[in-house]
Amino acid sequence: VEYKSIHKGVMHACGHDAHTAMLLGTAEVLSQLKDKIKGEVRFIFQPAEEGYAGAKFMIADGVIDGVDEIYGMHVWNYQPSGTIGIQDGPVMAAADMFTIKIQGVGGHGAAPQGTVDCVIVASHLIQALQTIVSRNTNPLESTVLSIGQVNGGYNFNIIADEIILRGTTRAYTEKNKQLIKNRMKEIVMGIEKTFSAKIKLDYKDGYPPVVNDKTITKNVERAAKIV
């Protein structure tokens, strides 16, 4: 396709071409039925939805002023073709991201006594962070803390003086979102003191969870059964 990424082998993969076709198709059908519609229907394409607050700018511009209900949908690879996934209450978790910079003292692998080994510090920190989900949050309330990147080191026999960790957290409630964030700060401070390292946590708040209204969800369910 012509609208592919300029970076070879990299794609967003959300299926926004499908979303565009779905919304335009809906607009075409409803425009043919406009005489039967009591009220106003707006069709919204949300820009910059992945972390750049496109919806926030749309709200500021007055796009949803006077809107009583809003419906959105997203393609999903786990959903069988020809079906619609419907759920009231929490359906998508709050998604935050974080970067942790660990600074120590490098040196030769044969003389570790004069160093602050960032690999050791990082390994303890990663293990400690996992206890937030397993020991601090309610097992009945789904939460996730995942570290997807560990970067650092120079060579097989050189003790690393800096390591960068990057990851994400997910929570269905604001309470758990804040709990994870606060515990991360506490654990970072404890590990920093334990190993005499310098650790900086850069935690970026993302979007709040998606919580579907029960009545509106029932409307979608009834319509889906008819279609």
In which residue ranges do the predicted regions lie?
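Histidine/acidic-residue-rich, glycine-tolerant segments that coordinate divalent metal ions
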Residues: 2-11, 17-18, 23, 35-160
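Ordered, soluble secondary-structure elements with a strong preference for glycine-centered loop motifs
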Residues: 12-13, 112, 174-179
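Histidine-anchored nucleotide/phosphate-binding helix
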Residues: 24-30
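A generic secondary-structure signal
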Residues: 29, 61, 190-191
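Amphipathic alpha-helical interaction elements
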Residues: 32-35, 172
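Metal-dependent amide/peptide-bond hydrolase catalytic core
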Residues: 120-227
